[in-house]
A protein has these predicted regions:
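Anion-binding catalytic surfaces of enzymes that hydrolyze or transfer phosphate/sulfate esters
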Residues: 293-353
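Bacterial N-terminal signal peptides
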Residues: 12-23
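Bacterial N-terminal signal peptides that target proteins for export
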Residues: 2-14
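Hydrophobic alpha-helical segments
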Residues: 12-13, 82, 177, 334
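N-terminal catalytic scaffold of extracellular/periplasmic and nuclease hydrolases
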Residues: 28-305, 313
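N-terminal low-complexity/intrinsically disordered extensions
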Residues: 14, 31-33, 352
Length: 353
């Protein structure tokens, strides 16, 4: 039966739950929306009545008030930050929400994470085209290019098989960061993994094999065919701020420098004798290269040139192990990256993994 009763529909929460509230007065308040009354387990006559949760009235009414306060976006953002948590599916997010709530002395499920307070949210399906269990190379490519692709490849389309160097030259995909640079935005990539690892590499690299982080992992046929390793592609990319780990992919095997950040000897792994740090610095006299937290803290945010910070031979240390190192935290790197980008341009794009 068609009803003439007013109905208000709105989305609320990270899970995009659709609520349709019928017949509520336009001036509904937090205390008047729903009165507490017994709720039956089923429609049977012997159903056990349960008291409605005391917070239901406030929760539903507050959600309605928040939804009514929303307004269309009438301006264009000057900058954007893309936060990616590796493996950050609904189960991980739910666990994080519960833990955060329990740390505040509540049961946990009723809590909200920071981004769940944003006015809009959506789900994005980034599955691989050739297998059900996705990997971060193909999924990050989907995020940054808008094209789903095969597992294990970066910045190339699904018509290319993993490891196919020749085929990869025919199917490059433009990334969001390349488009941003072309449009005049300043760009940055921050990660506590190797900067050549799959997710950050998807911002700038085009390769049929995520493991080709340096030329050491590349087969001879791929080298002869002209494919470039990921570290070399970073040197060629025009990114203004780069912070992460993975120094070993940029240095020759003859380089045995000791990093100030602990983590052992910063032995290079390249077999072509190239020092990519020097190659990157040689592109402009204004560029800066740093390897520890002290240098990051002392870095002038108004520095003109690009900044490259590689703080460990491989991944940065986990938080509970970082006390004995001079490595910056993800927060340290992100804060400084934002300051640097803001000093370079009003319009900028940053990836944080």
């Amino acid at each position: 039966m068609k009803s003439n009763t007013p109905k208000t529909c709105f989305t609320y929460g990270f899970a995009a739950l659709l609520l349709c509230v019928t017949g509520l007065p336009a001036t509904v308040g937090a205390d008047s929306a729903i009165k507490e009354k017994p709720v039956a387990r089923s429609g049977r006559s012997n159903a056990v009545p349960l008291p409605a949760p005391r917070e239901v009235a406030g929760t539903y009414a507050k959600a309605l008030e928040d939804a009514r306060a929303l307004r269309p976006i009438d301006h264009q953002a000057d900058s954007a930050i893309i936060f990616i948590g590796d493996g950050m599916g609904m189960s991980t997010v739910t666990a994080a929400r519960i833990l955060a709530g329990q740390r505040e002395g509540r049961s946990g499920e009723e809590g909200m994470l920071a981004w769940e307070h944003l006015p809009s949210s959506a789900f994005v399906k980034t599955f691989n085209t050739n297998q059900q269990v996705a990997d971060s190379a193909g999924t990050a490519t989907a995020i940054f290019t808008g094209h789903r692709t095969n597992s294990g490849v970066l910045g190339i389309g699904p018509s290319v098989s993993r490891g196919d160097c020749e085929g990869s030259k025919r199917a490059p995909l433009a990334s969001l960061f390349e488009l941003a640079t072309g449009a005049g935005l300043a760009t940055g990539v921050v990660t506590d993994t190797r900067i050549t690892h799959a997710t950050p590499a998807a911002a700038y690299a085009h390769t049929p094999e995520r493991d080709w982080e340096s030329n050491l992992e590349m087969p001879e046929a791929a080298r002869e065919a002209g494919c470039k390793d990921i570290a070399t592609q970073l040197v060629d990319a025009n990114i203004d701020v780069v912070f992460g780990g993975g120094l070993r992919a940029f240095l020759p095997q003859t380089d045995f420098r000791q990093l100030a950040s602990g983590g052992g000897s910063g032995v290079g792994e390249r077999t072509d004798g190239r020092n990519l740090v020097q190659a990157w610095l040689a592109q402009s006299p204004d560029r800066r290269f740093i390897t520890d937290k002290d240098a990051l803290d002392k870095l002038d945010p108004s520095v003109d040139g690009a900044v490259l910070g590689l703080f460990a031979p491989s991944h940065l240390a986990y938080r509970y192990k970082r006390a004995n190192t001079d490595q910056p935290s993800l927060t340290d790197m992100t804060t400084r990256a934002i300051e640097l980008l803001q000093s370079k341009s009003k319009r900028w794009l940053l990836l944080v993994e």
